Amino acid sequence: MQESAYFFRFGEAIYRHKMTIVIVWLIIILSSLPFLPQVVSPFKSTGLVNDHSISAKADNFLKKSLPFYGPKLLVLYKSSTISTKNPLFLAEITASLKKLESLDLPYKITYPSRSNAYLYGQNHHAAYVIISFKADAHLSDEKLIELKNLIQPAQHMKLFLGGEPVFIQNTNQQTQQDLVKADMIAIPVTILVLLLIFKTLIASSIPLLLGGSCAVLMLVTLFVLAQCFSLSIYTLNIALLLGLCLTLDYCLFLISRFREELTTSASIKHALAMTQASAGKAIFFSGLAVFASLSALFIFPINMLFSVGVGGIVAVSIALLLSLTLLPALLGLIGLRINHFSLLPVHLFNLRHLHFWRTMATKVTYRPLSFFVVVLIFLLCLGYPFTRVNPGISDLGVLPKHSNSRQFFDEFQHSFAVNTLTPLTLVVHTRKPLLSRASLKSLVQLNQSLKRHPFVLKVNNIVALNQALNAKDYYHLYKQPDKHLNKLLKQTSGRYFTVFTLISRFPMGSAQTNALIEDIRHMQLDSNVRIELTGTPVNNYDVMQTIKAYFPYALVWVMLFSYVILLILLRSLFLPFKAILMNALSLCASYGVLVLIFQEGHLHQWLHFEPQGMLDMSLLIIIFCALFGFSMDYEVFLLSRIREYYLQTKDNTLSVIYGIEHSSKIITSAAMIVIVLCGSFMFADVL
């Protein structure tokens, strides 16, 4: 095969320049280490937004047009002894925030008052304030710490901090802690698994060395890219997991094949070249398949999916580069010493050692239909719960209960309607000046129409101050000089627009709230006004609709490119189709298990998490792209080994038995490594 010849010569070239390759990689890795302490700092948003949607454009319009339509910090005050009706309650809140005057950032504080009655709790023992910043305000971790220190404890109250800046800070901090926790669990277990697989100290240590190198290079590369692109705070965890799994898998494939070739090759150079021509070629095409699967994330105009796509592509690229250059160079330097320092008896290539897999493969090949039906029924049964999937968007429930954001949310919902935290925001544009008679009449009509909707709990705007006032009354009211009215107009309106905030009676993401969004978008409006919707419920709804609209294109992309890559590798029309079909079945089975455990809550007591009643839509897409690529990884390695023997014997049955016999142990070992790495993240506090 021409491709094999290329990889054979590539292996010989690596052997000739092995020392140079190792030194170059060592310099790159060492020069990356100083950046590690600050890798998390550029990741500042969840990324759950479609930047091209009407809601995102409306949000950007408000950020440019209103003075304090930027990050918001929420401070919740609760007292068991003082009522909100007592003047002392507001006095203590004011005193608590007094030191904010020394803050060097422009800000605005919205206190609870008669005109802001929604800031008072239903039980009259809680209230919260909103500290708003300008859209271009950079609330770094240091600035947030300064803010928290300036907010003084109230004498008779407990206070809790919330808002998106706190959520992002909590998520970043928890991500760092989770990475350390996962490493503490994964590293010793991975070492044990590698020792059981390779049975020698040197062979077992190489995958750890490559995995650590991959982690360093990947984190620093994403840090650099985050200076150029807005990347989601969830990128690091997912990318790190993908990178480590791929690197360790590729190490297992290459090292095991190298040790096998050492037993039959006349020289180390020839063994390395043969390894590259077989396992190296399989790894290259496997990487292309994973690359194609993850690149489908770029089809979605969602920042979070784009971010994970960037992280995944970086992970695959670095894993491939290390596995196809640094790893062979190290193997060339180590040579026969790869089998030194044996900790367990080494019978790696003894035929009796392969008896189990040969027996199983023989039984399967002689009764293929029976095994196919049994496995198919099993996978379909596992996948059946997926028919009950309830896709949604994750909220603060993914954070641990001890985080500031989660504590704020849990306390908030005891005293307030949770929906007040996530109102729908209507940007109402008028053709004539906002305070003209015609515009005010249109605004009053719109306000009344919204209030009549059965799903609407409350509407706030400049024509909802008093139910007794009509358009004519508001016209005369805003003609009068009044500092409070002027302040209200400055905060909510411009010359040709104003903002309505609307609270739904139903939870964010519910069918009723989504129906409300559609109803408002299709309202029959006065010709003088035009509305745009934004706000968290609208952004989330747009994200869901965007994912549903673009998923068929991503599906075709993944299937088509996977088929083409396998077609080039295997020179068969049927085998790529078979591989894609099996991947689809295993993916459905995985989704079914996810529904059973994480949506419906089975085993949640043992796994120590709170079921959310839904599965995150973006996570389902990420799992599809990543898992399809990963399962293709094993398909490529197994089928390439089967084809290699088929080209020698032209016997289909024997080649299948041979491929399973010589590949299954290393594939199951690689899968075990992936299970260990993924399992270590089960102990993470971010769900």
Predicted features along the sequence, with ranges:
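Membrane-embedded transmembrane helical bundles of large multi-pass transporters/channels
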Residues: 1-41, 106, 135-391, 525-528, ...
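Membrane-proximal amphipathic alpha-helices
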Residues: 47-48
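Loop-to-helix "switch" segment enriched in basic
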Residues: 44
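Structured non-transmembrane domains adjacent to transmembrane bundles in polytopic membrane proteins
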Residues: 52-71, 81-162, 393-600, 604, ...
